């Protein structure tokens, strides 16, 4: 058993609201430096401990962005490379791009640069997915990824987004969270947006 205690840091008030929200699709908006990637990593760590065996996926557009904003900070916070294995809070498998916790929880890291790459997500199943910088993705990408959030276990099934104004996905993000105009198969009660205190 790891002998270390995880320090989650101190979230800002809006980050606390995002972290404790239980809507099915929760978005966190704000400018650069607003703590969007940090809040994703924090939520992923909390859920990994709170729900043993849970599977979570963090998605960014490119692998370098994924590495810089999530893999490096999370493996560092969880001391995945500590020379004393008893102080490691989790194990990182670079070939599988997966962090595994002693309780069986997993955080998977995936990138999605183009719509033609969606085939790589065929058959993918997870309990929670994080779409970081969601406005960089098309609506078809979002809907395909949202369909991966499923399963028969008792874990919560949610999608968390972070977003900035602009980008190829600006209109669908605005439709869901600002204009709140929904298609026939969408539930207005599923979606909620928080904005960063630093925005």
Question: What positions do the PLM features span?
Answer:
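Phosphate/NTP-binding elements of NTP-utilizing enzymes
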Residues: 1-196
């Amino acid at each position: 058993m790891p002998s270390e205690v995880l320090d989650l840091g101190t979230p800002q008030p809006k980050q606390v609201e995002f972290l404790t929200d239980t809507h099915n699709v929760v978005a966190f908006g704000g400018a650069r430096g607003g703590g969007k990637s940090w809040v994703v990593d924090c939520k992923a760590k909390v859920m990994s401990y709170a729900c043993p065996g849970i599977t979570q996926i963090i998605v960014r557009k490119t692998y370098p962005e994924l590495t810089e904003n999530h893999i490096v900070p999370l493996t560092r916070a969880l001391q995945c490379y500590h020379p004393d294995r008893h102080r490691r809070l989790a194990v990182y498998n670079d070939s599988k791009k997966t962090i595994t916790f002693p309780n069986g929880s997993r955080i998977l890291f995936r990138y999605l640069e183009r719509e033609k790459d969606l085939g790589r997500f065929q058959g993918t199943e997870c309990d929670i997915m994080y779409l970081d910088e969601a406005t960089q993705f098309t609506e078809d990408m979002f809907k395909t990824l949202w369909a991966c959030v499923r399963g028969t276990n008792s874990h919560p099934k949610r999608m968390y987004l972070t977003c900035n104004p602009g980008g190829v996905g600006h209109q669908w993000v605005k439709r869901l969270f600002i204009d709140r105009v929904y298609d026939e198969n969408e539930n207005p009660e599923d979606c909620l947006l928080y904005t960063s205190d630093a925005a």
